Amino acid sequence: MRVVILGSGVVGVASAYYLARAGHEVTVIDREAGPALDTSFANAGQISPGYAAPWAAPGVPLKAVKWMFEKHAPLAIRLDGTRFQLQWMWQMLRNCTTERYALNKGRMVRLAEYSRDCLQALRAETAIQYEGRTGGTLQVFRTQQQLDGAAKDIAVLREANVPFELLSSDELKKAEPALAAVSHKLTGGLRLPGDETGDCQLFTTRLAALAEQLGVKFRFNTRIDALAVAGGKIAGVQCGGEMVRADAYVVALGSYSTNLVASLVKIPVYPLKGYSITAPIVDAAKAPVSTVLDETYKIAITRFDDRIRVGGMAEIVGFDKRLRDARRGTLEMCVNDLFPGGGDTEKATFWTGLRPMTPDGTPIVGRTPVPNLFLNTGHGTLGWTMSCGSGQLLADLMSGKKPAIRADDLSVHRYLSETDGEHRPAYA
């Protein structure tokens, strides 16, 4: 089958790789000059299945009000003048219940755990290198309230059989030796030893090269204007003055997926703006070993070979990609507070990207009501974590194979009806 994939981020490239490996003829189209040059370029670098969780959580609405008045708030909202933003925020609010949080987190952990397994198999098969580490993820708490609040996440981890360790402030240094110097600031931590880290942009670039060896064709610097429809199916992709045709089409354009498919299927994917800095390491003994999540500021601090990546925050501000110095200040404050002297933040590069977020946090992977149109988008802050699993899952669905995990509640159809009790539809 001839397949056109729109988007060459980590999710689009992973889809291309697994579809090509399944025997399909694949072409990837992207407006950028190469793979992973937009949202996948400088994310936090963590591969954290156990920490896969929706931003829509109990208590978040009240916290959002409090964060409006805080200098280093992890969430900010600025109206963009669209009705879609208001609808999306209302849908997110409806998912901020204990029941919905558990349901959505369970779906996300299922896909994320599977994706980690797919990544490990890929690494064993291809020996792909991307500055990866397998040192786990450590979430640190600054207050007893935060530590107690982790109980709801631990319950989901137990149900999903995800290994975890609950650490006291004195035990944190076992996982991250550099935290010994600041243990007095911390109450404890939750460690997931099965998590990994790695440079997403480097991984995507090298996976694209492996995909090319399987026959995948990449068309970069190509504008994607519209999907042409005929007879109730996609007839082609309008790219400037050219119509690109195939048998099936995959939209993996992240936040830009929504507008492209708007006339065919309504998907609640909104851009959630995030920031990162990447600083050179100056003292490895004072730097993190793997990924550390600061629960207070919702910031991830990740170790690469000779760099520290610090990423986080969420701004609901539309497609605004302006860099804000205040956000850089928050990232620098956080890493210097937990790992003083580890990296040179004055020499750090500053970046922002738009994560494609659904109101329930769960990505949209699979078929649509249009017979030959498929989606692989809406992964939010977890595109890197979920990429390989989403790609393999989509390849299985498009090849007529039974997926290794449940997939029906990951498709866009969960938003199209709220009457099917078995599917436990999302609020959208």
Curated annotation (Swiss-Prot):
NCBIfam families cross-referenced by the UniProt entry: PRK00711.1
Sequence positions that bind FAD: 3-17
PANTHER family reported for this sequence: D-AMINO ACID DEHYDROGENASE, SARCOSINE DEHYDROGENASE-RELATED
Pathway: Amino-acid degradation; D-alanine degradation; NH(3) and pyruvate from D-alanine: step 1/1
GO biological process terms held by the UniProt record: D-alanine catabolic process
Cofactor names: FAD
Protein name per UniProt: D-amino acid dehydrogenase
Similarity section: Belongs to the DadA oxidoreductase family.
Top-level taxon in the UniProt lineage: Bacteria
Functional description taken from the UniProt entry: Oxidative deamination of D-amino acids.
GO CC annotations, alphabetized: cytoplasm; plasma membrane
